[in-house]
């Protein structure tokens, strides 16, 4: 059984069995027909993945690796806030007539800040510290910038990464670990999507910094299942998980800004039937 499937199944069961409902409360999200999008939610969900043992992609249904990678590179590498730079239409609902989502996501990672070592944006600061001061406890990014929230077409869901490097006994290479903080996570539409893309990011950064990957800890303040997703989730978690596939990252690339969506793949990826036309709350 894929470990990622096991984590997902247990999380969804916990939400369904022990979560609380927002039905009847004042909620922002709504369905396309204007109906309020209520959820069953759990506070403070923490999921751990050891990337050195397994790539955390679901086999219950397919997670689109290249599209997920394209999105994380759009944010972290291109530092873009324009959906025209993407190969998918996931963000279309939040873009203006020019394709911009405002001062959100990639925009924030591209803002340069003054450090003692010079002007750098947050991504370059992370790479600099991982290479030059790997045991620092200050290696992190944060894109939830309050002064710019009014100019964001949507607030960041996954908003912070904290990196931590360890030296395992008997290992020559350092190990890169990270905590992904997320204020809100849609279990069906976004959970494994986010897990996969940040796992890819960690693999890329580890390779660039001559490290090996370790643990990724996913901290979710509000993990939820939307009311119209409940029957879909109930069916999904009854499926038989398959073995986890092997992750491949182009070993010839050692510059983070040279990676493309074509430099990643999963080998031996078997998965259950895809779920079509998932309703998305906006």
Residues covered by each model-derived region:
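Terminal, non-catalytic protein-protein interaction segments that mediate quaternary/complex assembly
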Residues: 1-282
């Amino acid at each position: 059984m894929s470990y990622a499937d096991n984590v997902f199944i247990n999380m969804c069961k916990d939400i369904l069995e022990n979560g609380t409902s927002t039905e009847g409360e004042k909620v922002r999200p709504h369905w396309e027909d204007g109906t309020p999008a209520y959820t069953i939610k759990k506070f403070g969900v923490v999921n751990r993945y050891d990337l050195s043992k397994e790539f955390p992609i679901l086999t219950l249904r397919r997670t689109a690796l290249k599209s997920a990678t394209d999105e994380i590179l759009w944010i972290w590498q291109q530092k873009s806030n324009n959906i025209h730079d993407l190969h998918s239409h996931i963000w279309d609902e939040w873009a203006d007539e020019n394709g911009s989502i405002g001062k959100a996501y990639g925009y924030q990672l591209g803002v340069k800040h003054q450090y003692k070592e010079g002007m750098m944006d947050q991504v370059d600061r992370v790479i600099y510290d991982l290479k030059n001061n790997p045991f620092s406890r200050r290696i992190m990014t944060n894109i939830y910038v309050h002064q710019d929230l009014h100019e964001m077409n949507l607030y960041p869901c996954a908003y912070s990464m904290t990196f931590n490097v360890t030296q395992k006994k008997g290992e020559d290479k350092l190990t890169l670990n990270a905590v992904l903080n997320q204020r809100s996570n849609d279990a069906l539409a976004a959970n494994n999507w986010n897990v996969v893309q940040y796992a890819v990011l960690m693999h890329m950064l580890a390779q660039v910094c001559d490290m090996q990957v370790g643990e990724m800890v996913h901290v979710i303040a509000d993990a939820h299942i939307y009311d119209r997703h409940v029957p879909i989730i109930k069916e999904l978690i009854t499926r038989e998980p398959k073995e986890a596939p092997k992750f491949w990252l182009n070993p010839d690339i050692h510059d983070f800004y040279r990676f493309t969506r074509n430099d990643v793949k999963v080998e031996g990826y078997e998965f259950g039937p895809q779920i079509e036309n998932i309703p998305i709350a906006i």
